[in-house]
Structures are given as structure tokens and as C-alpha cells.
Amino acid sequence: MFEDPATRPRTLHELCEVLEESVHEIRLQCVQCKKELQRREVYKFLFTDLRIVYRDNNPYGVCIMCLRFLSKISEYRHYQYSLYGKTLEERVKKPLSEITIRCIICQTPLCPEEKERHVNANKRFHNIMGRWTGRCSECWRPRPVTQV
């Protein structure tokens, strides 16, 4: 389908433009399990701002289950260290608003309010493979407290 790597669309929006289809019509398969993405998974892929990957010149996305699984595997294999928000700003020499931070579970880019929530709750951001992660509001849940 897309033989020249230089002209391949990288985002779902670009792919839709090239194929002259809307986001509501486009069909993608998961790069891992090869199942067709459900409509809500296509929308989530778009919202998450992930990149299209190619196998045998065909475009692929990733389903929600595989994305969560791959995120967990990446966390286990490639975790480097964690920092509090203030320390992260000092280390990177940028304010949190300019640092790209994705959710450690669903890979959604964190909005400024979600980053601020980490700071206010005194939670750390994690460096995994050189990329910063935290938790989005959808995946945020407090750790269970054990009672003695």
C-alpha cells in the first residue's frame, strides 16, 4: 500500500487525508493481535496521538488491550528512575507545561491539570526508555490503604 517510507503518513489524520476517508470510516488492524480496531479504539488512537506503524507496507494501529499490555511490559523492562515535578523541571530545565508526559497505562498525553495533580498529590513522574510518564485522570486511582 505505502511502499515509499518517506511518503508514509505517520498520524491517523494524515492517513485519513491520503486515503480520502474520514476518521469515522477508516479501518485499521492492531499491529500486535491483528484484530480490526473497534470504532472507539480508532478514536482513542486518534486522541492519544500515537503514530501509525507499517508492516509489509500496510498501516497498523494498536488496540486498547495491546497498548495497555505493551505499556506494562515497557514499564517492567525499561524503567529508569522517578522524580517529583519540581525536580523534573530542574533536571530538564523546562516547566512541566513544556515537557511531554504520557500516561504510564494508556499513553494519553497528560494535560496541564493532570501534571499539576501529580505535583499537588506529591506523586512522581517516571522515566521509561527516556520518556516521561505519569497517570492521566482516567487511569488515576489511589493505592489501596491497608487497615491494621
UniProtKB/Swiss-Prot annotation:
Annotated InterPro entries:
E6 (IPR001334), E6_sf (IPR038575)
Question: The motif PDZ-binding domain: which residues?
Answer: 146-148
**Pfam families per record:** E6
Alphabetical keyword list: Activator, DNA-binding, Early protein, Host cytoplasm, Host nucleus, Host-virus interaction, Inhibition of host innate immune response by virus, Inhibition of host IRF3 by virus, Inhibition of host RLR pathway by virus, Metal-binding, Modulation of host cell apoptosis by virus, Oncogene, Transcription, Transcription regulation, Viral immunoevasion, Zinc, Zinc-finger
Family affiliation: Belongs to the papillomaviridae E6 protein family.
Any extra remark in the record?
A: Belongs to the high risk human alphapapillomavirus family. The cancer-causing human papillomavirus E6 protein has a unique carboxy terminal PDZ domain containing substrate.
Q: What name is this protein filed under?
A: Protein E6
Q: Which organism does this sequence originate in? A: Human papillomavirus 52
